[in-house]
Amino acid sequence: MLLIDNGIEKMALKLQQRQNLSHIEFLKVRLGMQVVVINTFKAIVTYGLALLLNIFLYTLIVHLTFLTLRTYSHGAHAKTSMLCHVQNIVAFVMLPWLIVQYDISFQFLLILSLLSALIVIKYAPAATKKRPIAPKKVKGLKIKSIIVFVLLMTIACIVPPPYNRFVVYGVLLQSFTLLPIFSIKEEV
């Protein structure tokens, strides 16, 4: 990782010199590069494991569903990059694999989605310390979160098995990040 950090540092310094960036702009550029590299690495590991377990498409469906709802509902983030990485593997690879292995029924997940509906209605959008929400945007984001939830659940009822299970699971997963127990830990 040190080699990658050094490479990012050198590239950011070159950009700073060429573009005459202030120190703050340099730090922003460097942080942006670090985020891209870290997220690329996480994606390679997560989707690589999904490929090895033959659940790539299921992982992708869960991830896309999760991100679609998260766009409007926001929610908790992991405290560290490493914890985020571990949570990604558990949430997007191991749990979908378990859903396949133990043939968790769509009906069971659908019943759990009622809990998700209550969570989204009550807690979305969930602000965090790193991603606060302006008070004037809360009502609009709540309405959009509920609409997206309904659309995703409608899609889950239309798409064939086993894909419908992973749409519902993605919604469940994202709704749990809205719970206040995670916001308190992040000190909203």
From Swiss-Prot:
The chain crosses the membrane at residues 49-69, 104-126, 143-163, 166-186. It is a multi-pass membrane protein. InterPro entries: AgrB. Its main location: membrane. GO terms for molecular function: peptidase activity. The keyword Cell membrane applies. GO terms for biological process: proteolysis; quorum sensing. The keyword Aminoacyl-tRNA synthetase does not apply. It is found in: Cell membrane. Keywords: Cell membrane, Hydrolase, Membrane, Protease, Quorum sensing, Transmembrane, Transmembrane helix, Virulence. GO terms for cellular component: plasma membrane. Disulfide bonds: none annotated. It comes from the Bacteria. Its EC number is 3.4.-.-. Belongs to the AgrB family. Essential for the production of a quorum sensing system signal molecule, the autoinducing peptide (AIP). This quorum sensing system is responsible for the regulation of the expression of virulence factor genes. Involved in the proteolytic processing of AgrD, the precursor of AIP. This is Accessory gene regulator protein B. It comes from Staphylococcus intermedius.
